[in-house]
């Protein structure tokens, strides 16, 4: 699967997670509805579903992972920034096959596309601090 397919999966997952948080609708129904409107040919659908199901299922744990690296409460974050951080922390915590630098970069790129003017700087700062303090930058992946 091409990396760009996974990037599109993250972008789609972000939009569905945003919608889910605002509407409190069923995440699977939201995903199906969202994908009806998209060209699914260039999206890693399996990864898209992994993200939305994994994040919504383990949302409290992911949020707890984030809290020590935020200088404000989760409730004070914008919905987009919170969703981006959830995707990035999910990848850092659950996907050892994805290099931490990729997770950080993808979070920054999502913030540039969907976030407010300076949200990419905020996302970068939070993720850099988390990677350093949690020791992800020293992680060795054995294949």
Swiss-Prot record:
UniProt cross-references to SUPFAM superfamilies, sorted A to Z: NusB-like
Keyword ATP-binding recorded: no
Family to which the UniProt record says this protein belongs: Belongs to the NusB family.
Descriptive protein name: Transcription antitermination protein NusB
Pfam families attached to this UniProt entry: NusB
NCBIfam families with a match to the protein in the record: nusB
Origin species: Buchnera aphidicola subsp. Acyrthosiphon pisum (strain Tuc7)
GO process annotations (BP): DNA-templated transcription termination; transcription antitermination
Cited HAMAP family: NusB (MF_00073)
Function, in words: Involved in transcription antitermination. Required for transcription of ribosomal RNA (rRNA) genes. Binds specifically to the boxA antiterminator sequence of the ribosomal RNA (rrn) operons.
An annotated GO cellular component: cytosol
């Amino acid at each position: 699967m091409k990396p760009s397919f996974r990037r599109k999966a993250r972008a789609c997952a972000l939009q569905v997670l945003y919608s889910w948080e605002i509407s409190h609708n069923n995440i699977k129904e939201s995903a199906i509805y969202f994908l009806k409107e998209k060209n699914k040919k260039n999206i890693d659908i399996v990864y898209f579903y992994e993200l939305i199901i994994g994040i919504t299922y383990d949302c409290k744990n992911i949020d707890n992972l984030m809290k020590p690296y935020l200088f404000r409460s989760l409730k004070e974050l914008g919905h987009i920034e919170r969703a981006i951080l959830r995707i990035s922390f999910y990848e850092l915590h659950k996907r050892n096959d994805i290099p931490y630098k990729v997770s950080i970069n993808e979070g920054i790129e999502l913030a540039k596309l969907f976030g407010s003017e300076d949200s990419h700087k905020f996302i970068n700062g939070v993720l850099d601090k988390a990677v350093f303090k949690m020791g992800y930058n020293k992680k060795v992946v054995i294949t």
